[in-house]
């Protein structure tokens, strides 16, 4: 009986996602829309202009940016579209 209970506990721990994971978009501006599962608790969207036009980068976390780059960070699934 104890073995069965221990087995059920182990299976439950392995099968459950014990830490919350976040889903963020992670494509560059000219790429097809893709998502990734992140360990971080936020998503970001960076926007800037260069000789190619407006560039948009998306991903997990909330990185620091250089002057002239706009950054938006958010904390819900797929919020960085």
UniProtKB/Swiss-Prot annotation:
SS bond list: 24-43, 38-60, 62-73, 74-79
Keyword Signal: yes
Pfam family, one: Toxin_cobra-type
PROSITE patterns registered for this protein in UniProt: SNAKE_TOXIN
Expression by tissue: Expressed by the venom gland.
Functional description taken from the UniProt entry: Binds to muscle nicotinic acetylcholine receptor (nAChR) and inhibit acetylcholine from binding to the receptor, thereby impairing neuromuscular transmission.
Protein name (database record): Short neurotoxin 2
Organism: Drysdalia coronoides (White-lipped snake)
């Amino acid at each position: 009986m104890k073995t069965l209970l221990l087995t059920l506990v182990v299976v439950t721990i392995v099968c459950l996602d014990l830490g919350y994971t976040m889903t963020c978009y992670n494509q560059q501006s000219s790429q097809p829309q893709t998502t990734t599962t992140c360990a971080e608790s936020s998503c970001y969207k960076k926007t800037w202009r260069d000789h190619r036009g407006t560039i948009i980068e998306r991903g997990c976390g909330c990185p620091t940016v250089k002057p002239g780059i706009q950054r938006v960070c958010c904390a819900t699934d797929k919020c960085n579209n």
